[in-house]
């Protein structure tokens, strides 16, 4: 009888885009064809060199960036071929590609489908062209609509659309209009993030007219209400899906499934080992697969580290965490470890326990950052 393989997720970083957006702090930027070719060689060498997970089964792959759809489709096809030759894939593995409007065409999409991509995540951010311009996006809303239609025509039956609230000069009415317009297109999944102005980005240097905290809270509360009207359920702080279409890759992160990340700045968790790849692209290219030069911040997680992650990642999901699973993993009853914190937030009606699960309430979700920080021992 075959031994059951452990589930594994793979993340592939493609650090190229047409132009960096004003709010982006990811390791990304424009790249020439020669740079992309050099990067592909280094990426394939890293995948070849990785020794972990020979006994695992890949349940999801996520190509992020940057903008993976901005590079030659052949690169992504070759990387997928390399991954399939190295790892065992489950029959129904979820394989996602991040894409931006203005970088997709019929040929590329056919290529993606042929190589096994079955989910596409398209960055829209807003249906208002003036908001897109402020964000430094390369596309209009009309171009997003065209890309969405092309993806459907190419056979993508699982499409996510990214939206952003809390934008400069954004009103509640404009946010609601973005939500309803996208929901009416009927994607399977919507990710609705609040803008965070990160240090070192162009936005950080500007004096922005941002919505106040009360307006942002109202925008957040309305998001779940509006999307529910269109058949979307909230399964995580920023994610909404039609039944059966919650992103399995994201859920894997929140449940601490093993994952390996390839490319500069990519993070990995395998067993109780965690590491992050160098964010220095030139160093990554020179290393050409030498893992000792690529991997940084390697650490062995203690049981306490793992407990903390179990709580603050698991409680991001609306279904919360299983108290029995906590005890099974750590050999301790959850109230013996976190009793004080649990009582505090249950008394404030921000956390609830029901049928062996602990989850944030609707009010708890809106102040989740404060609550989750309290689970650090």
Task: Label each region the model flagged.
Residues 331-344:
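Short amphipathic alpha-helical interaction segments
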């Amino acid at each position: 009888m075959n031994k059951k393989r452990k589930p594994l997720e793979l993340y592939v970083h493609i650090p190229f885009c047409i132009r960096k957006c004003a709010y982006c702090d990811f390791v990304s930027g424009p790249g020439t064809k020669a740079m992309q070719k050099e990067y592909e060689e280094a990426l394939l060498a890293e995948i070849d060199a990785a020794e972990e997970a020979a006994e695992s089964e890949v349940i999801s792959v996520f190509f992020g960036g940057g903008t993976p759809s901005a590079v030659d489709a052949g690169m992504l096809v070759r990387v997928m071929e390399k991954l399939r030759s190295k790892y065992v894939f489950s029959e129904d593995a979820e394989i996602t590609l991040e894409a931006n409007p203005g970088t997709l065409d019929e040929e590329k999409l056919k290529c993606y489908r042929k190589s096994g991509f079955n989910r596409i995540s398209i960055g829209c951010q807003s249906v208002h062209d003036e908001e897109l311009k402020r964000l430094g996006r390369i596309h209009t809303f009309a171009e997003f609509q065209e890309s969405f239609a092309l993806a459907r025509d190419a056979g993508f039956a699982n499409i996510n659309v990214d939206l952003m609230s809390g934008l400069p000069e954004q009103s509640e009415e404009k946010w609601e209009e973005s939500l309803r317009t996208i929901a009416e297109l009927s994607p399977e999944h919507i990710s609705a993030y609040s803008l965070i102005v990160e240090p070192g980005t162009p936005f950080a240097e500007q004096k922005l007219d941002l919505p106040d905290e009360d307006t942002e809270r109202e925008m957040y509360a309305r998001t779940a209400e509006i999307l529910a009207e269109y058949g979307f359920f909230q399964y995580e702080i920023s994610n909404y899906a039609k039944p059966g279409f919650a992103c399995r890759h994201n859920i894997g992160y929140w449940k601490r499934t093993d994952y390996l990340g390839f490319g500069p700045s990519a993070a990995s968790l395998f067993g109780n080992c965690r590491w992050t790849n160098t964010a220095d692209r030139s160093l990554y290219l020179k290393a050409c697969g030498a893992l000792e030069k690529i991997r940084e911040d390697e650490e062995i997680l203690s049981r306490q580290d793992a407990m903390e992650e179990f709580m603050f990642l698991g409680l991001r999901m609306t279904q919360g965490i299983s108290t029995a699973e906590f005890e099974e993993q750590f050999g301790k009853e959850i109230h013996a470890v976190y009793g004080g914190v649990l009582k505090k937030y249950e008394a404030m009606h921000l956390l609830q326990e029901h049928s062996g699960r602990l989850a944030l309430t609707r009010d708890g979700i809106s102040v989740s950052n404060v609550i989750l920080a309290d689970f650090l021992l």
